[in-house]
């Protein structure tokens, strides 16, 4: 099953850098050597086994954008499942950026009226921390106004923290069919294990696919932080030619289990009940693997 995803925005807004971090295992500092995208770069990213993201990374130079909106209009904007538009927060051509975005929205409305729209307000690490909330809200309001009658989902992002994983996890989640069936079964598993939380990660990208929680946690970005940390750990393992299989982290307050789950996922189980032995949790994970394999395969077919 293929899903066409457009990645658009002005030149040097950070589109190719974020794609390389999420899908090609780059670390943030290595993206500095990436060149400028010329015209359209196509990549096919296999996700959850049978789901293929047909990612069109569109160069943002003015000449290319004009071509996308005229001679290539139908070719670029037809059969699109998701449009990801990246705004560079430091751009000095603010009005032109909004005008170009509105032109893309018009083309999407005409050629792929059911496409989902995600706007990433990028390079937020360059904004003083005490100004980020206000700046993001103002930018989001302006983007929503420019998008009417479509309703975009906006995220603040940076390649230097977990916000990039938060945004892309949400984007990929929107592309997974029958994901509610998976969530229902994950809820049941969480209750059976008497876990505080259970999180499912895609194996190649370590993006969050789904999660279930029985206890409220104040840090809403915790999963994305874990994605970032574990992916860095995976890269370290691969450099030393070691294969990651499982991990258990325990202190006086909780135990966290991260284990290879199905052929395309990892699972994380968080436990705080001291009366439940590690062996019981590990057995539950082992027993659930074959059960979840069929649900995850069905969601990507």
Swiss-Prot record:
InterPro entries: Gtr1_RagA, P-loop_NTPase, RagA/B, Small_GTP-bd
One Pfam family here: Gtr1_RagA
Gene Ontology biological process terms from the UniProt entry: cellular response to starvation; negative regulation of autophagy; phosphate ion transport; positive regulation of TORC1 signaling
Residues reported in the UniProt entry to bind GTP: 9-16, 57-61, 122-125
CDD domains in alphabetical order: RagA_like
Molecular function in Gene Ontology: GTP binding; GTPase activity
GO cellular component, one term: lysosome
Assigned keywords, A-Z: Cytoplasm, GTP-binding, Lysosome, Nucleotide-binding, Nucleus
Protein's cellular compartments: Cytoplasm; Nucleus; Lysosome
PANTHER family assigned: RAS-RELATED GTP BINDING RAG/GTR YEAST, RAS-RELATED GTP-BINDING PROTEIN
Family: Belongs to the GTR/RAG GTP-binding protein family.
Purpose of the protein: Guanine nucleotide-binding protein that plays a crucial role in the cellular response to amino acid availability through regulation of the TOR signaling cascade.
Protein name per Swiss-Prot or TrEMBL: Ras-related GTP-binding protein A
Lineage: Eukaryota, Amoebozoa, Evosea, Eumycetozoa, Dictyostelia
